[in-house]
Amino acid sequence: SLLATQIVIHNEFSNIARKTGGIDYKEIIEGVVSDKRWSIQGSNETFIPSIVDYFQPGYGYGGSCFPKDVKALLEYSKGLDSKSLVLDSVIKSNDLQPLFVEEVLKENVDLKDKKKILILGTSFKPETDDIRESSSIKIVEICSKLNLEIYIHDPLSQEKFIDSLKTNLIGVKDWKKEILIMDIVLISTSWPEYKLIEELYKEGLLDQKVIIDGRGFLDNKIFKNNYFSVGSSKNS
Protein backbone atom coordinates (compact mmCIF):
# COMPACT_ATOMS: atom_id res chain seq x y z
CA SER A 1 0.00 0.00 0.00
CA LEU A 2 2.89 2.32 0.71
CA LEU A 3 4.37 1.70 -2.74
CA ALA A 4 0.97 2.22 -4.38
CA THR A 5 0.70 5.52 -2.53
CA GLN A 6 4.10 6.58 -3.89
CA ILE A 7 2.88 5.91 -7.43
CA VAL A 8 -0.31 7.90 -6.94
CA ILE A 9 1.24 10.93 -5.25
CA HIS A 10 3.85 11.27 -8.00
CA ASN A 11 1.13 10.95 -10.63
CA GLU A 12 -0.71 13.82 -8.96
CA PHE A 13 2.47 15.92 -8.78
CA SER A 14 3.16 15.17 -12.45
CA ASN A 15 -0.38 16.26 -13.39
CA ILE A 16 0.23 19.57 -11.65
CA ALA A 17 3.54 19.95 -13.50
CA ARG A 18 1.92 19.23 -16.88
CA LYS A 19 -0.87 21.74 -16.36
CA THR A 20 1.48 24.40 -14.98
CA GLY A 21 3.49 24.46 -18.19
CA GLY A 22 7.22 24.66 -18.84
CA ILE A 23 7.96 21.79 -16.46
CA ASP A 24 9.24 18.29 -17.16
CA TYR A 25 8.52 16.05 -14.18
CA LYS A 26 11.39 13.74 -15.15
CA GLU A 27 13.77 16.59 -14.38
CA ILE A 28 12.06 17.20 -11.05
CA ILE A 29 12.59 13.55 -10.08
CA GLU A 30 16.25 13.79 -11.06
CA GLY A 31 16.58 16.71 -8.67
CA VAL A 32 14.69 14.94 -5.89
CA VAL A 33 16.84 11.80 -5.98
CA SER A 34 20.02 13.87 -5.87
CA ASP A 35 18.97 14.89 -2.34
CA LYS A 36 20.83 12.83 0.28
CA ARG A 37 17.52 12.03 1.99
CA TRP A 38 16.53 9.97 -1.05
CA SER A 39 19.91 8.57 -2.07
CA ILE A 40 23.20 7.42 -0.59
CA GLN A 41 26.06 9.74 -1.39
CA GLY A 42 29.30 7.79 -1.86
CA SER A 43 32.75 9.27 -2.30
CA ASN A 44 32.68 8.77 -6.07
CA GLU A 45 29.08 8.00 -6.96
CA THR A 46 25.48 8.27 -5.79
CA PHE A 47 23.50 5.13 -5.04
CA ILE A 48 19.82 5.45 -5.93
CA PRO A 49 17.44 3.17 -3.98
CA SER A 50 14.98 1.10 -6.02
CA ILE A 51 11.98 2.83 -4.43
CA VAL A 52 12.68 5.67 -6.85
CA ASP A 53 11.23 3.43 -9.58
CA TYR A 54 7.83 4.17 -8.03
CA PHE A 55 8.33 7.92 -8.50
CA GLN A 56 7.90 7.73 -12.27
CA PRO A 57 4.51 9.04 -13.44
CA GLY A 58 2.22 6.94 -15.59
CA TYR A 59 -1.35 5.70 -15.95
CA GLY A 60 -1.48 4.35 -12.39
CA TYR A 61 -0.75 1.05 -10.69
CA GLY A 62 -2.28 -2.27 -11.72
CA GLY A 63 -1.62 -5.99 -11.55
CA SER A 64 -2.72 -8.55 -9.00
CA CYS A 65 -1.13 -7.09 -5.86
CA PHE A 66 -1.40 -3.33 -5.47
CA PRO A 67 -5.14 -2.91 -6.21
CA LYS A 68 -6.05 -5.85 -3.97
CA ASP A 69 -3.71 -4.88 -1.15
CA VAL A 70 -4.80 -1.24 -0.96
CA LYS A 71 -8.49 -2.18 -0.96
CA ALA A 72 -7.91 -4.88 1.67
CA LEU A 73 -6.09 -2.51 4.01
CA LEU A 74 -8.80 0.12 3.54
CA GLU A 75 -11.53 -2.40 4.42
CA TYR A 76 -9.50 -3.61 7.40
CA SER A 77 -9.18 -0.06 8.71
CA LYS A 78 -12.93 0.42 8.35
CA GLY A 79 -13.49 -2.72 10.41
CA LEU A 80 -11.42 -1.14 13.16
CA ASP A 81 -13.42 2.07 12.86
CA SER A 82 -10.18 3.78 11.87
CA LYS A 83 -10.63 6.28 9.06
CA SER A 84 -8.04 6.11 6.29
CA LEU A 85 -8.60 9.13 4.11
CA VAL A 86 -5.27 8.60 2.37
CA LEU A 87 -6.00 5.04 1.20
CA ASP A 88 -9.46 6.03 0.03
CA SER A 89 -7.95 8.88 -1.97
CA VAL A 90 -5.22 6.62 -3.38
CA ILE A 91 -7.84 4.34 -4.93
CA LYS A 92 -9.91 7.21 -6.32
CA SER A 93 -6.91 9.05 -7.73
CA ASN A 94 -5.53 5.91 -9.37
CA ASP A 95 -8.89 5.25 -11.04
CA LEU A 96 -8.88 8.76 -12.51
CA GLN A 97 -5.31 8.77 -13.83
CA PRO A 98 -6.03 7.22 -17.27
CA LEU A 99 -8.38 10.15 -17.99
CA PHE A 100 -5.19 11.91 -19.06
CA VAL A 101 -5.70 10.08 -22.36
CA GLU A 102 -9.24 11.38 -22.86
CA GLU A 103 -8.11 14.91 -22.11
CA VAL A 104 -5.30 14.79 -24.67
CA LEU A 105 -7.51 13.25 -27.36
CA LYS A 106 -10.34 15.74 -26.95
CA GLU A 107 -7.99 18.72 -26.95
CA ASN A 108 -5.70 17.69 -29.80
CA VAL A 109 -7.53 15.34 -32.18
CA ASP A 110 -10.42 16.13 -34.51
CA LEU A 111 -12.79 13.37 -33.44
CA LYS A 112 -15.57 14.20 -35.91
CA ASP A 113 -14.17 11.66 -38.35
CA LYS A 114 -13.32 8.14 -37.17
CA LYS A 115 -9.64 7.86 -36.32
CA LYS A 116 -7.36 4.85 -35.97
CA ILE A 117 -5.42 4.40 -32.73
CA LEU A 118 -2.69 1.87 -32.04
CA ILE A 119 -2.37 0.98 -28.35
CA LEU A 120 1.07 -0.46 -27.66
CA GLY A 121 1.05 -2.76 -24.65
CA THR A 122 -1.81 -4.45 -22.83
CA SER A 123 -0.11 -6.02 -19.79
CA PHE A 124 0.02 -3.96 -16.61
CA LYS A 125 3.83 -3.80 -16.85
CA PRO A 126 6.52 -5.14 -19.22
CA GLU A 127 7.95 -8.66 -19.05
CA THR A 128 4.62 -10.24 -18.03
CA ASP A 129 1.38 -11.34 -19.65
CA ASP A 130 -0.66 -10.27 -16.61
CA ILE A 131 -3.51 -7.96 -17.66
CA ARG A 132 -5.25 -7.79 -14.29
CA GLU A 133 -6.14 -4.17 -13.47
CA SER A 134 -4.11 -3.06 -16.49
CA SER A 135 -4.50 0.62 -17.38
CA SER A 136 -5.03 -0.53 -20.97
CA ILE A 137 -8.51 -1.73 -20.01
CA LYS A 138 -9.57 1.78 -19.02
CA ILE A 139 -7.81 3.27 -22.02
CA VAL A 140 -9.77 0.99 -24.37
CA GLU A 141 -13.00 2.09 -22.65
CA ILE A 142 -12.07 5.73 -23.24
CA CYS A 143 -11.17 5.13 -26.89
CA SER A 144 -14.39 3.19 -27.50
CA LYS A 145 -16.42 6.02 -26.03
CA LEU A 146 -14.70 8.42 -28.44
CA ASN A 147 -15.57 6.12 -31.37
CA LEU A 148 -11.96 5.36 -32.29
CA GLU A 149 -10.99 2.33 -34.35
CA ILE A 150 -8.77 0.46 -31.90
CA TYR A 151 -5.72 -1.60 -32.82
CA ILE A 152 -3.56 -3.21 -30.14
CA HIS A 153 -0.20 -4.92 -29.82
CA ASP A 154 1.54 -6.69 -26.96
CA PRO A 155 4.38 -9.23 -27.17
CA LEU A 156 2.80 -11.58 -24.60
CA SER A 157 -0.75 -10.69 -23.60
CA GLN A 158 -2.41 -9.52 -26.81
CA GLU A 159 -4.74 -12.48 -27.43
CA LYS A 160 -5.63 -12.81 -23.76
CA PHE A 161 -6.52 -9.13 -23.66
CA ILE A 162 -8.74 -9.31 -26.75
CA ASP A 163 -10.54 -12.40 -25.43
CA SER A 164 -11.14 -10.87 -22.00
CA LEU A 165 -12.62 -7.57 -23.18
CA LYS A 166 -15.06 -8.92 -25.76
CA THR A 167 -15.00 -5.61 -27.64
CA ASN A 168 -14.12 -4.62 -31.19
CA LEU A 169 -10.34 -4.71 -30.95
CA ILE A 170 -7.98 -5.48 -33.80
CA GLY A 171 -4.76 -7.25 -32.86
CA VAL A 172 -1.66 -6.58 -34.95
CA LYS A 173 1.43 -8.73 -35.38
CA ASP A 174 3.84 -6.27 -36.94
CA TRP A 175 3.28 -3.03 -35.05
CA LYS A 176 6.17 -1.34 -36.88
CA LYS A 177 4.26 -1.75 -40.15
CA GLU A 178 0.77 -0.96 -38.83
CA ILE A 179 1.92 2.18 -37.04
CA LEU A 180 2.38 3.84 -40.43
CA ILE A 181 -1.37 3.86 -41.17
CA MET A 182 -2.47 5.08 -37.73
CA ASP A 183 -3.67 8.54 -36.74
CA ILE A 184 -2.80 8.10 -33.07
CA VAL A 185 -0.15 6.02 -31.31
CA LEU A 186 -0.45 5.41 -27.57
CA ILE A 187 2.17 3.72 -25.41
CA SER A 188 0.41 1.90 -22.59
CA THR A 189 3.14 -0.52 -21.47
CA SER A 190 6.84 0.34 -21.61
CA TRP A 191 8.06 -2.71 -23.50
CA PRO A 192 11.68 -2.02 -24.63
CA GLU A 193 10.87 -2.74 -28.28
CA TYR A 194 8.59 0.31 -28.40
CA LYS A 195 11.68 2.52 -28.05
CA LEU A 196 11.99 2.02 -31.80
CA ILE A 197 9.32 4.73 -32.14
CA GLU A 198 12.12 7.25 -31.60
CA GLU A 199 13.96 5.98 -34.68
CA LEU A 200 10.79 5.88 -36.78
CA TYR A 201 10.13 9.49 -35.82
CA LYS A 202 13.67 10.55 -36.70
CA GLU A 203 13.17 8.98 -40.12
CA GLY A 204 10.11 11.21 -40.65
CA LEU A 205 7.63 8.33 -40.67
CA LEU A 206 5.48 9.57 -37.78
CA ASP A 207 5.37 13.33 -38.39
CA GLN A 208 1.60 13.59 -38.81
CA LYS A 209 0.64 11.24 -35.98
CA VAL A 210 -0.41 12.12 -32.45
CA ILE A 211 1.82 10.24 -30.01
CA ILE A 212 0.62 9.77 -26.43
CA ASP A 213 3.33 8.53 -24.09
CA GLY A 214 1.58 7.91 -20.82
CA ARG A 215 4.66 6.25 -19.36
CA GLY A 216 7.12 9.06 -20.04
CA PHE A 217 8.97 6.26 -21.79
CA LEU A 218 10.39 8.04 -24.81
CA ASP A 219 12.94 10.85 -24.97
CA ASN A 220 10.68 13.88 -25.36
CA LYS A 221 13.57 15.99 -26.65
CA ILE A 222 13.43 14.05 -29.93
CA PHE A 223 9.87 15.05 -30.82
CA LYS A 224 8.96 18.34 -32.45
CA ASN A 225 5.17 18.16 -32.61
CA ASN A 226 2.11 16.21 -31.52
CA TYR A 227 3.90 14.37 -28.70
CA PHE A 228 2.10 14.28 -25.34
CA SER A 229 3.71 12.80 -22.27
CA VAL A 230 2.49 12.37 -18.72
CA GLY A 231 4.31 14.80 -16.44
CA SER A 232 5.23 17.24 -19.20
CA SER A 233 3.33 20.13 -20.73
CA LYS A 234 5.42 19.85 -23.87
CA ASN A 235 3.43 19.48 -27.07
CA SER A 236 6.80 19.41 -28.74
What are these regions (language model features)?
Residues 1-236:
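Structural/interface elements that position substrates and couple domains in central-metabolism enzymes
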